[in-house]
Regions:
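Periplasmic/cell-envelope proteins involved in peptidoglycan metabolism and beta-lactam response
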Residues: 1-306, 319, 328, 403-415, ...
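Beta-lactam-recognizing serine transpeptidase/beta-lactamase-like catalytic domain environment
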Residues: 71, 193-204, 245, 250-334, ...
Length: 611
């Protein structure tokens, strides 16, 4: 009996000891968690019971050179519902259906869904949001947001660009200067129960967003509007495919206007222009049969094998392209300015040198024709430029030779991109030096068999007429802080010593005679010395008989303050650059030279040597 009692006592002590050890372990673990891991579990609890919603920051504005707003913000609302807080569901459903123009069944689905918060509609007009807020219905949230707004509609659409549904830039300056414009979002912190549903009575904590900075650009609305009207007019008159006009300051690279018609509506960027919509309709859409198992738009295919959605996206991408910098073309005779500058700089030609044009030039086994098949006869170099004579410039190219011509091509910056502050700039398409023969050299010398962008041509010619400084064509000028105080000035690279001052002066003088006495006479303006060069180039394939008519001009010729380039794609009827494109630049210059404060002067003494 005594043995049994002793045995039972031992068992009790063992159990008691185990319990003590377990309690000690539990208390120790509890002390450890409460004292040493409290921060971790506090954060975990907060994560479970707090919900964070973003408050979008107001995006910075884009302003033109004179302070006119080109891109701004409109206040819109996001309407949401919180299931647990709704007391009158039928009233909520009826109100939201009426005000938001949404089917009641769709609203009911969101109202009856058990979730922390359910968005009913975004981008609601502020007036509508205010009306819903005034009804003070429990469980209905009205949060203010921002939507990008473009006061000038389609003006400079391919330059300014637009934003997406998340208010982030997609194309143009909107995406290039995203970090400056976007601002810093704020937060709304709310407390939720175990199911993740917001607890209304506990309120919410807000962190205010920081507004984005604004961007001042060199583009001038008045100049852009006039240039855009001029482009539309000539496009309609000549039934052209498209027209591009670039106007920039050759001294500092600031771009005053960049026109690419047809433009598109920045406030409705996903709707095709009429001509592109016609292309979509003509692409041969095949409607699926009634028993087709694909009900989405993706099932609808065009005759090209692409879905309707894919084809539309292709056309949208085409509509958004900026041909002045996204597309390359054969510049034709405007490129003779580059050959002229290289020849003068290298000393292989001078203004008084004599040439003979029989209407063609034989290079190796090829006869390369002049635009004037009967020939220009005997002429000096200046007259060759006035006549836009191909054999003269072929001869200058051959005198330079492949090695030197390629050297100047590189020295002038033509093998590099300009570095302009718009995304998607295309590079030059040029023969490799090792693959160039004399025939290729001959065709390059008058602007054929290679391709560059319009902005590249404008930047290169600027460096040849401004004294030899390679400026970067750009739009960005300065940044404004949210409080409208001036922020940083935007600075772009400048490269010195492209050509000598003497060569630059000779180029200006020769090009002035092209307008005053030669093929560019349709750009002449009384009282102003205008320099320029015409071009008429045939697109590939040559057999299609499609042309690009262009004119590059600058003023005043003695000290250029503005350079203009007009390119007309596939004009109908008369297609010569001097006849079609030169008058466009003349009309623009007549209008904007006084606007820029450039006064008329005596131009009688401004002439080229040897002419």
């Amino acid at each position: 009996m005594k043995k049994n009692m002793t045995f039972h006592k031992r068992k009790i002590w063992v159990v008691l000891l185990c319990c003590i050890l377990m309690m000690t372990g539990l208390i120790g673990r509890l002390v450890y968690l409460m004292c040493f891991r409290s921060d971790y579990y506090y954060k975990k609890a907060k994560e479970l019971h707090e919900r964070e919603r973003e408050i979008k920051a107001a995006r910075g504005e884009i302003l033109d050179a004179r302070g006119k707003v080109l891109a701004s913000n409109r206040t819109v609302c996001t309407i949401s519902v919180i299931h647990s807080q709704i007391k009158e569901p039928e009233k909520v459903i009826a109100l939201l259906s009426e005000k938001l123009k949404i089917d009641e069944a769709e609203v009911r689905k969101r109202v009856e869904k058990i979730s922390s918060i359910e968005i009913v509609k975004t981008n609601v007009e502020k007036s509508t949001g205010d009306e819903i807020r005034e009804c003070s219905l429990a469980g209905v949230k009205v949060d203010e947001d921002y939507k990008r707004y473009y006061p000038c509609g389609s003006l400079a659409s391919k330059v300014i660009g637009f934003t997406g549904g998340d208010n982030q830039g997609i194309i143009g300056l909107e995406v290039k200067y995203e970090e400056i414009l976007r601002g810093q979002p704020g937060k709304i912190l709310t407390t939720t129960d175990a199911r993740g549903v917001e607890i209304d009575k506990l309120g919410e904590t807000r962190e205010k967003p920081i507004e984005g900075k604004s961007l001042i650009i060199s583009l001038d609305v008045n100049i852009q509007e006039f240039a855009q009207q001029s482009a539309l007019k000539v496009m309609e008159e000549k039934q052209a495919e498209r027209v591009s006009i670039l106007l920039m300051n050759p001294q500092n690279g600031e771009i005053y206007a960049c026109v690419n018609v047809p433009e598109f509506d920045l406030n409705d960027p996903f709707t095709l222009t009429d001509d592109l919509n016609m292309q979509l309709n003509e692409s041969g859409i095949t409607i699926p049969s009634e028993d087709h198992n694909e009900q989405s738009e993706l099932a609808v295919q065009t005759t090209s094998g692409k879905t309707n959605t894919e084809r539309k996206q292709e056309l949208l991408n085409q509509m958004w392209r900026n041909p002045c910098l996204n597309d390359t073309y054969e510049p034709g005779s405007t490129f003779k300015i580059i050959t002229m500058a290289a020849g003068l700089e290298a000393g292989v030609v001078s203004p008084g040198d004599r040439f003979y044009c029989p209407g063609y030039k034989v290079v190796e086994d090829r006869r390369i024709h002049c635009a004037k098949r009967t020939g220009h006869g005997s002429q000096n170099f200046v007259e060759g430029a006035q006549n836009s004579c191909n054999p003269v410039f072929i001869e200058v190219g051959l005198r330079l030779g492949i090695e030197r011509y390629y050297k100047y091509f590189r020295q002038f910056g033509l093998l590099d991109k300009t570095g302009t502050d718009l995304p998607g700039e295309a590079g030059t398409i040029m023969h490799q030096k090792k693959n160039m023969g004399e025939v290729e050299l001959a065709t390059v010398s008058f602007g054929q068999s290679f391709q560059i962008t319009p902005v590249q041509l404008a930047a290169t010619v600027s460096s040849l007429i401004n004294g030899g400084r390679r400026v970067t064509p750009h739009f960005g000028v300065a940044v404004l802080n949210p409080d409208r105080t001036e922020g940083e000035k935007l600075i772009f690279p400048v490269k010195e010593g492209i050509v000598s001052e003497e060569t630059s002066k000779e180029v200006r003088e020769i090009l002035e005679t092209v307008v005053s006495q030669g093929s560019g006479k349709n750009a002449k303006i009384e009282g102003y010395a205008i320099g320029g060069k015409t071009a008429t180039s045939q697109t590939l394939p040559r057999s299609a008989n499609r042309y690009i008519s262009s004119f590059l001009g600058f003023a005043p010729a003695e000290d250029p303050q503005i350079l203009g380039l007009c390119i007309i794609h596939d004009p109908k009827g008369i297609y010569y650059g001097g006849t079609v494109a030169a008058p466009v630049i003349r009309g623009i210059f007549e209008n904007i030279l006084p606007y820029l404060g450039i006064e008329k002067n005596d131009v009688s003494d401004f002439s080229a040597e040897g002419n």
